[in-house]
Amino acid sequence: MCPECFFLMLFFCGYRACYCSSSFSSSSSSSSSSSFRSSPAYGFSGRPPGGAGCRERSQRSCLRPGGLPSLTRNPGLQRPFRSRRLCRAVACAPGIPAKGRRDVRGNAVSQTALHVVAAGPCSLPAGCHTPV
């Protein structure tokens, strides 16, 4: 399992303090080959001596029998997504169209650009296209 997936699973299941600093400090004092294997940057392929049991316990309590995290069982996670989808389908703020705001910004930028271009001829004696 990749380290990002593992930490996301720990975050959602509530086991944030599973790997403490003592397990990393004890794994960093070992030899170079074992510290390479057990460092968190290389995907937890080796097991640190202090944190292996904690990791196993948190995975077992977090995973469903099918092997996937039980993120869909929490009704609190589903309600905001459902309301957001409904909000996208129905216009939430009908008085302020988003397209009109974008057009105003685009016109302001284009008007400014035209004003800068039409300011007048170049005052340099050699011309505007001469590299500095």
Curated annotation (Swiss-Prot):
It comes from the Bacteria. Residues 25-79 are annotated as: Disordered. Keywords: Plasmid, Signal. Residues 25-39 have a biased composition (Low complexity). The gene is yubK. Residues 1-17 form the signal peptide. This is Uncharacterized serine-rich protein YubK. It comes from Escherichia coli (strain K12).
